[in-house]
Swiss-Prot record:
GO terms for molecular function: ATP binding; dethiobiotin synthase activity; magnesium ion binding. NCBIfam families: bioD. Belongs to the dethiobiotin synthetase family. The keyword Nuclease does not apply. It comes from Helicobacter pylori (strain Shi470). GO terms for biological process: biotin biosynthetic process. Keywords: ATP-binding, Biotin biosynthesis, Cytoplasm, Ligase, Magnesium, Metal-binding, Nucleotide-binding. InterPro entries: DTB_synth_BioD, P-loop_NTPase. This is ATP-dependent dethiobiotin synthetase BioD. SUPFAM superfamilies: P-loop containing nucleoside triphosphate hydrolases. ATP binds at residues 10-15, 116-119, 176-177. The gene is bioD.
Length: 218
């Protein structure tokens, strides 16, 4: 199982998760995309949320899948899951133990299960647990997606420090847009220096699909 998080919201988790799953499936690795918690959605009027896109891809493998099969807690408020849950369904806290059981059931059917978190690793799910806690309970490998803008160095290093301190199996990958010429002169020079000294280098997502698939499967 691979848990995909990000250095912050809007870093491109969903885009990268879909690209990686498409690559894996093209290589013969049956891969499903799950997003157990999604906020800021209205399924009545918006059929293009992250989970709707996941469902579209997943149905190439199993036409019987529904939205509720791959996303279990859905909230209209665009906020941390804890805040959305307390405002919209105060008497029904998110049950992470139930989440884990439902997510792990997919490992019986698929070669690779990709689980996308909401926001970054420290986003609260309950008063006691955050996204990192969920990944730890799942015993999943972790892929953190970074944006490619100014500030990515600090964001990547903070996540690297957090994950390294927990002695986890993780990779950090930069979601590099085609039109971001500034990245190569502003941020890449330090990333290259960091990688020379690190035994867990930061990679460019678009250039590393084969490596990331191998990481997820090992």
């Amino acid at each position: 199982m691979l848990f995909i998080s990000a250095t912050n919201t809007n870093a491109g988790k969903t885009t990268c998760a879909r690209l990686l799953a498409q690559y894996c499936n093209a290589c013969g690795v049956r891969t499903i995309l799950l997003k157990p918690i999604e906020t800021g959605v209205n399924d009545t009027t918006n059929h293009f949320s992250d989970v709707h896109l996941f469902l579209q891809d997943n149905r190439l493998l199993d036409r019987s899948l529904t939205l509720k099969d791959i996303s279990f807690y859905r909230y209209a408020k665009a906020s941390a899951p804890l805040i959305a849950q307390q405002e919209e369904n105060q008497n029904a806290p998110i049950d992470t133990n139930d989440l884990i059981q439902r997510l792990q059931n997919f490992t019986k059917t698929y070669d690779l299960v990709i689980v996308e978190g909401a926001g970054g690793l420290c986003v609260p799910i309950t008063l006691e647990e955050n996204m990192l806690d969920l990944a730890l309970k799942l015993k999943a490998k972790i892929l953190v997606i970074s944006h490619d803008n100014l500030g990515l160095i600090n964001d990547c290093l903070l996540n690297d420090f957090l994950l390294k301190s927990h002695q986890l199996d993780y990779k950090i990958a930069i979601n590099l847009r085609e039109n971001n010429a500034a990245f190569h002169s502003v941020s890449l020079p330090y990333i290259e220096l960091f990688n020379e000294r690190s035994n867990n280098p930061i990679v460019i997502f678009q250039q590393s699909l084969k490596e990331l698939m191998s990481f997820a499967l090992k």
